[in-house]
């Protein structure tokens, strides 16, 4: 891992429910707001600085530069949902960039998908601040108060995602209630992959 690493943790909300479109393509749902937490961490994964940013639909193209400069993009169910929902707005899929999906690893270990709220509740002792269905209701209402609630809801989900990621990275485990309402603990590995630098003939010569 580099001495300093840029990470972007993100989440988004959509304008429609799946039952409002003709298939299950997230790209047709429309994105209402995207919130992200951009930070710099040192080689020991300690945060040096960070900031929360939110973007409404008309400004989503501005996020590409932020994502493109990240050493790791972090989300929850982001590869199978958020990335697809963003396809109409960004020049390339985020999956083509260094992308870590927490749920992907949880499912690989657990064999089943687990909700963000369940992991946050048992791992962090925190919960979502609102019913997820209200996010679309707030967008439809579109008044100042509703949009403020929508933005805060999305940002708080980013905070949960960030804190779950940090807990898993540090403790190498996550805790949640499974399908049968049993509390389970699973081992996880959120560490960065080892980077093996290719040694050229010139580099090799300098070793002797």
Residue ranges and their predicted role:
Residues 124-186:
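Acidic, Mg2+-coordinating catalytic module of metal-dependent nucleases/exonucleases
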Residues 11-13, 82, 101, 157:
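Acidic active-site catalytic centers that drive phospho-/nucleotidyl reactions
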Residues 1-68:
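Conserved RNase H-like, two-metal-ion catalytic cores of nucleic-acid enzymes
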Residues 39, 84-88, 118-122, 163, ...:
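Residue-level signal for well-ordered alpha-helical scaffold segments within enzymatic catalytic domains
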